[in-house]
Amino acid sequence: MSDMFLPARMRKLKIITLDQYSDSVVRSLHEEGVTQIDDISERIQQDAEWRQILKPSRATPYTGRVSSLLMKTSGILDFLGSVAAEEKGLRDTIREFINPPIFEKREVEELDTESLIERAEETLGRVESETRVMEEKLNELDSERSAVESSLSVAEKLKDFDIDFSDLQDSEYITGIAGRITAENLPELRDKLADITDELVISDREGENKAERILIIVTLKKHADSIASVLRRMEFERFEISELQGRPSEIISSSKTRLEEISRERKEIISKLRDINAEWEDELLVLREQLEIEKERNEVFSLFGETRKTVMLEAWVPLKEADRVIAVVEESSEGTALTDLEDPDPEEVPVLLDNPRFAKPYETFVEMYSPLKYNEIDPTIFMAFVFPFFFGFCLTDAGYGIIDALIGFILYRGLGKVNNFMRNFGIIMMSCGVWAFILGMVTNGFIGDFFPRFFNITLPTVIPAIDAFVNPQNILIMALTVGVLHINFGLILGARNNIRLGNMREALGSQIVWLILELGIILYLVGGMIFGAPLIILAFAMLLYYNGLFGLMDVSGFLGTLLSYARLLALCLSTGGIAMTVNILTGLSYEMIPVIGVVLAPIIFVFGHIANNAFQSLGAFINSLRLHYVEFFAQFYMGGKNKFNAFRAERNFTKIRR
């Protein structure tokens, strides 16, 4: 099998450069973004021979300052962004989801670290001079609003009491307590307080409902602790009244007035901050990105080794990019760097998936399962064909397929413009929707039995033999046939992997044996015992030889794996069955419920099918993944531990001026 079905071929690149060119080399590699920097500092510390030549390098002295400025920039952006979002409505959110604003990359100069720090300090100083006072004022208003709302809440609960709260404040001799207790506990509370002292006054009113009572207790201060202890045991909810002055009605009136004033003041400040955000947001986004990139560049030096005048680093580079990377290093070091390209140890190589453009979105699914081993076959291309087909098989409804494809298109053309994950997910959903449409049209599924039930017509594209409502047994045969082909392809990949790696025993005992058993069963069914029996006996002998008695038990497990593909039929029928039920309820509502049925029927139809499509699409997605992860990958996927992490300058808002 050609290298196109394997992860990217990698090489280890060793670079030695003069210290004066190290920053230039790092910047060039960072902008190219096709290498992974390897950490050699730990190896230097552990290897005595290396320690004689090199010492571990350190992050640059600018790292701390750059990190601090980055945190400050992010904090200002988060603050201004949260303020700008306060007035954003649902319509704005939906509009941005469907058609998010695209940031036009700004050309920036390639600055050294010191120059970038100076520029950042200047920019942040100007922004903070405008925002600091308003931010402090906004925090003060928010704190005051919380306090006023708390006072208002207490005053409204005590509004039935004709009392001035200043009379309840602690004095030298008396103390006042207000709170809430359940009505059933009130008699017991009175008795327990009477046992403590008769030097107290208890006033009570009905609370928000008859099950609770609002109390005000006035007593001598010397009894305060004893009474407080009893109140805690009786689940008494105490109100904070120490800051209240005046009568409840006065506090309610003044609190509402003050809350309105606070709201107006906040709106004025937020309006000004929104203007500041509009003026500075782009500049701050650019600055944050530059600081993030600079931080990575300054930190990466801690992975290097160094001598008095040179720096050494090691990087993993895809073979097809190696010549270009070496040329970049030569140019950035003015020809003074030494480079050496080595064949790697397969156990150490970080794995980079390298697939055609159409299969790229499915790499996420493979990486979610486990990183590949360097020399095993990458199943991404096969998954790109089979996953959407399985999804469509599970859904088999053309109407739902159209909806899913439209959702995928909206994601692709909307958030996909600014988010790579959403772009990939949109592509996957469009592919899945297309397959659901195709399979739905040939199996008589279009919003359930919509056309036959309401228009008494049959879809012209239906193949009668696989009409899901008439011949479900044929759909089952299709599902199991697909399952056998899928599993066998996995077995072939597994055998190929093991043979490639020299594990012939594993290939014979775990993959080839099942292919022989299947061939024997087919020959037995077609030609009888004389043709099939020898291969069946050979397969069982191989199971015993390579796997012992447990190998015979694996037969039932293998059969269960094949039967797992019956879930394709189960989900296919459940989609159509529930859709048909929604259509039946829609028809009954329209025909049997006078007047209101005309309104109710469309509601049942729309929301019923939306819910069914949502649940069935989710089920189709999960079960398609499961058939790959549990059934297909189990036949061949070995998995590794090292994933390629590119040392790349992520530029979403900037581009270097050349």
Curated annotation (Swiss-Prot):
Keyword Chloroplast among UniProt keywords: no
Compartments where located: Cell membrane
GO CC terms, sorted: plasma membrane; proton-transporting V-type ATPase, V0 domain; vacuolar proton-transporting V-type ATPase complex
Annotated membrane topology: Multi-pass membrane protein
Pfam families: V_ATPase_I (PF01496)
Swiss-Prot/TrEMBL keywords: Cell membrane, Hydrogen ion transport, Ion transport, Membrane, Transmembrane, Transmembrane helix, Transport
Transmembrane feature ranges: 383-403, 427-447, 475-495, 507-526, 530-552, 568-588, 591-611
GO molecular function annotation: ATPase binding; proton-transporting ATPase activity, rotational mechanism
A GO BP annotation: vacuolar acidification
InterPro entries, A to Z: V-ATPase_116kDa_su (IPR002490)
Cited Gene3D superfamilies: 1.20.1460.20, 3.30.70.2170, 3.30.70.2750
Major location (coarse): membrane
Biological role stated in the UniProt entry: Component of the A-type ATP synthase that produces ATP from ADP in the presence of a proton gradient across the membrane.
Family recorded in the similarity comment: Belongs to the V-ATPase 116 kDa subunit family.
Self-association state and partner proteins as the record states: Has multiple subunits with at least A(3), B(3), C, D, E, F, H, I and proteolipid K(x).
PANTHER family found in the cross-reference section: V-TYPE PROTON ATPASE SUBUNIT A, VACUOLAR PROTON ATPASES
Official protein name in the record: A-type ATP synthase subunit I
Annotated gene: atpI
